[in-house]
Amino acid sequence: MKQQKQKIRIRLKGFDQGQLDRSTADIVETAKRTGARVVGPIPLPTKREVYTVLRSPHVDKKSREQFEIRTHKRLVDILDPTGKTIDALKMLALPAGVDIKIKAA
């Protein structure tokens, strides 16, 4: 029989690209330090949302202003995680501007 390989897939999302890259580097460094193999970080497509609003409160339909928000995403796969890897990832403090989703397979 084949041995079942364990894998942890971590998806990170954030508006600030620098903060996201630092968080990803922290996760990769923590996983490598505990002896797990790491695939990534893989940059996923950036979602760009543009909002257009009128500048004036009453008239002047031609005068508009546009705002945009970009959501950057990264993917990290941790292959063959040990118990130390999972404990170290639980103790890792990430900034508030980074959303993290962890899926074990």
UniProtKB/Swiss-Prot annotation:
The keyword Calcium does not apply. The lineage of its organism: Bacteria, Pseudomonadati, Chlamydiota, Chlamydiia, Chlamydiales. SMART domains: Ribosomal_S10. GO terms for cellular component: ribonucleoprotein complex; ribosome. GO terms for molecular function: structural constituent of ribosome; tRNA binding. One of its GO terms (biological process) is translation. NCBIfam families: PRK00596.1, rpsJ_bact. Coiled coil: none annotated. This is Small ribosomal subunit protein uS10. Pfam families: Ribosomal_S10.
